[in-house]
Amino acid sequence: MAQMNFGGVIENVMTREEFPLEKAREILKDETIAVIGYGVQGPGQSLNLRDNGFNIIVGQRPGKTYEKAVADGWVPGETLFGIEEACEKATIVMCLLSDAAVMSVWPTIKPYLTPGKALYFSHGFAITWNDRTGVVPPTDIDVIMVAPKGSGTSLRTMFLEGRGLNSSYAIYQDATGKAWEKTIALGIGIGSGYLFETTFIREATSDLTGERGSLMGAIQGLLLAQYEVLRENGHTPSEAFNETVEELTQSLMPLFAKNGMDWMYANCSTTAQRGALDWMGPFHDAIKPVVEKLYANVKCGNEAQISIDSNSKPDYREKLEEELKALRESEMWQTAVTVRKLRPENN
């Protein structure tokens, strides 16, 4: 395990140098790994494991997702099964269902979690708030997690490009004494770049905070606020969108992703430098109390309960589509459609 300096704090990380793919294969050579759920994370993780030479099967109920698995090369009766049969065959059950689906399918999965098996998650939600989800594993199995820091699509794309998506890992229960090595081996097998240690509760709280905050909720709120102010002051949709979204996503984000924010500040105009340095403080001071409120709401379980209640409603999909339709048809994101068409690579 390597020790790395993260902003002055030393953390332990695991890379492919310390734990090569060959070692992962050796550790898991006698295991049958079943990916349960072929939705968001399922395809990327299962296909990467398959391509890396592991004994992998998929468990999925009939429907569109099942047909997608067939299209991806999983063979019914050989490597593709119903959930019950896949869980029965598996020694490692990778539960990659959505949080809502885990709750409904858990009674189906649990009887097959016999002593010595391992139960794997890629999100700490179901275990962290198991007083709300009802997901309480048997005490005589390993319960482990590898959580890629990105979508299943990104995990697969980066794997095919010869790169890797960083992942966190955690061990909730070690009944066999081998949970750690299984966890790291699976993390390497799915195509992780490097692996850093966490706990189920830390992963769940940071993940929900990030999704509602800077990764999705807050970024939409910030972009829309700036776009609206520009439009209210006479700027055209094209100008407002370019100055708010397009320049950020197409020009600036790749720069600070590669080189850091200080590098980006150092390589922009003096007018931009001064303004950014002066205004980052007021934005920080305005936003931090909102993030603190968000984190508290996540940590106490309120956000988990909101998600559970919402996803459990029979008309959830219909209401979700209504909300997404409103977002999609808003002026800002309709402007985006035209702007994207005008990008040079699309002409």
Predicted regions and their residues:
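N-terminal ligand-binding/catalytic initiation module
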Residues: 1-28, 51, 130-133, 138, ...
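NAD(P)-dependent Rossmann-like dehydrogenase/reductase catalytic/cofactor-binding core
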Residues: 2-6, 11-17, 232-347
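NAD(P)+-binding Rossmann beta1-loop-alpha1 motif at the extreme N-terminus of oxidoreductases
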Residues: 2-77
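Structural motif
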Residues: 32-34, 55-57, 78, 91-94, ...
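Rossmann-like NAD(P)-binding element
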Residues: 61, 70-128, 136-151
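Small-residue helix-packing motif on alpha-helices
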Residues: 66, 86, 102, 237-241
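Rossmann-fold dinucleotide-binding core
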Residues: 120-212
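Active-site-proximal catalytic alpha-helix in oxidoreductases
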Residues: 177-232, 238-256
